[in-house]
Regions:
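C-terminal and late-domain segments of enzyme folds
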Residues: 81, 85-166
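Short, active-site-adjacent cap segments at secondary-structure transitions
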Residues: 40, 72-75, 151-153
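Catalytic nucleophile loop
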Residues: 33-36, 59-78
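Glycine/threonine-rich flexible loop motifs
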Residues: 39-49, 114-117
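N-terminal beta1-alpha1 cap of cysteine-dependent amidohydrolase-like domains
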Residues: 1-31, 35
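Glycine/Thr-rich phosphate-binding loops of Rossmann-like dinucleotide-binding domains
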Residues: 42-43, 76, 83
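Alpha-helix C-terminal capping/helix-to-coil transition sites in glycosyltransferase folds
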Residues: 27-28, 61, 98
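Catalytic-core regions built around general acid/base machinery
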Residues: 49-62
């Protein structure tokens, strides 16, 4: 899957699972890419393997970081604005804190419509906007809803929406 979907052919992508020591893999990386998956499982693994601090250290030193989906969630102060199911509970919800706001990846406004046989039916659950409002009932950190396929470049405490909508 990695070889088929990785768009940057001139950059070799090596999974952390291919290393005997994940800490050393991060410490010696020339770039950090964290893909999608379940944010609870990812956050759990980062804490269990004691990778939060070393990731912060290498990224703050100037090593580039790119996060997609769950990788975007863990770039935030916490993973509290994920859309994922809690399949495992991490010790903490704190994540990398690379930006001073939360991101809700895969954001879309309004209700969802689901294909049902030949037609579509409205999903009557909460919208992402409603969930973000619920988050703000107990938290003051701003949240950016990042639409599918969008890209934010964050550098030197400044962000720019490069592709898509937020």
């Amino acid at each position: 899957v990695r070889e088929k979907s990785w768009p940057l052919k001139n950059i070799k992508l090596i999974g952390i699972e291919e290393y005997d020591n994940p800490y050393d893999a991060v410490k010696n990386a020339k770039g950090i890419y964290v893909g999608g998956g379940n944010s609870f499982l990812l956050t759990h693994g980062l804490h269990e393997n004691k990778l939060i601090k070393i990731l912060n250290d290498v990224i703050i030193s100037g090593i580039p970081y790119m996060g997609v989906s769950a990788g975007t969630n863990v770039a935030c102060p916490t993973m509290m604005t994920t859309n994922d199911m809690p399949i495992i509970m991490p010790k903490k919800l704190d994540t990398l804190n690379l930006v001073n706001f939360q991101i809700n990846p895969h954001y879309h406004e309004g209700p969802m419509w689901l294909k049902n046989e030949e037609g579509f039916v409205k999903h009557n659950g909460e919208t992402r906007s409603q969930r973000i409002n619920e988050y703000h009932q107990n938290n003051i950190i701003p949240v950016i809803g990042l639409f599918e396929g969008s890209l934010i470049k964050w550098q030197n405490q400044k962000g720019k929406l490069m592709i898509g909508d937020a």
